[in-house]
């Protein structure tokens, strides 16, 4: 059973492997990625100069690299590779090939 706090985003097949997609959920800018069949949801706003470009980043070593200045964030939790706070991450559920995320009004880590 799915909690009412989850929002329906898209079908898994709507995502391209390794390519981010941008969504606005409850006024939160989200970057969604599918890597090896697993789906990850992170804040789309980089803490460095607040660029909303994370969805355009490339994937390297289970991290997304911000295209603006090269900061790396772990896909699983949004933390910076060097241990900094990084990006907010959001719970994802896939039910019958539909992706749902729980994006609540979280303050940014920066």
Residue ranges, per PLM feature:
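Zn-dependent metallo-beta-lactamase
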Residues: 1-24
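Rieske [2Fe-2S] iron-sulfur-binding domain
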Residues: 17, 21-110
């Amino acid at each position: 059973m799915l909690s009412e706090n989850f929002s329906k985003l898209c079908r898994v097949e709507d995502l391209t492997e390794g390519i981010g997609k941008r969504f606005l959920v409850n006024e939160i800018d989200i970057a969604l990625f599918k890597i090896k069949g697993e789906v990850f949801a992170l804040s789309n706003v980089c803490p460095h100069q607040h660029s909303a470009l994370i969805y355009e980043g490339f994937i390297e070593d289970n991290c997304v690299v911000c295209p603006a200045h090269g900061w790396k964030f772990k896909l699983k939790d949004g933390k910076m590779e060097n241990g900094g706070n990084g990006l907010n991450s959001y719970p994802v559920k896939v039910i019958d090939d539909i992706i749902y995320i729980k994006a609540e009004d979280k303050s940014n880590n920066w």
